[in-house]
Amino acid sequence: MNLKDKSLFLGLGCCGGKQAKKLIEDYGYKGIAVNGSEQDLKALGNINKYHLSGFDGFGGHREKSIDCLSENEDFLDYVEHINEKIIFVLFGGGGSTGSGCATILTEMLSQNLDKKRIVCPVITLPSADEAIIKHSNAYQAVQELQEIDGLGATFFINNDIDKDYEYINSTFAKFIDTFLSNDAYT
């Protein structure tokens, strides 16, 4: 059994959902896309999804994530019962749904010592030409991630590499699949 079979991708917000879709559809990984926007979830097609009811995006306000998660207890229960050993938390650092929920969920997943999981945040950084609030959200998310003990590898995806975000997501998916599907690591 390779690491692929032990992994799950939790895609938060619009960016994380698109990344999770790529890994689920193109490489056969287990995963789920999570968002408050039904429109964003619908655009992802036929993959596992969870709608954060009552929150159609946070409008740039990461602090709404605490209220959102507390009002979606069934989603927190789902997260608590994830059995895979390696969990990748995918999100756009500049967004508010992903960057706000990701740090809370990453900490929650990594603190459950009974499950002995490896939790790996994957933060996509905003492009240099994006609004200052996007950079502020990403900065706050990175600061919060640094304070979480026991994290696995943290991946940073640089959106300044290319304006073709599909290409960036495809490249990351290919590289992570090459690593996780290699039988030499088991």
Predicted regions and their residues:
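Tubulin/FtsZ superfamily GTPase core signature
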Residues: 1-186
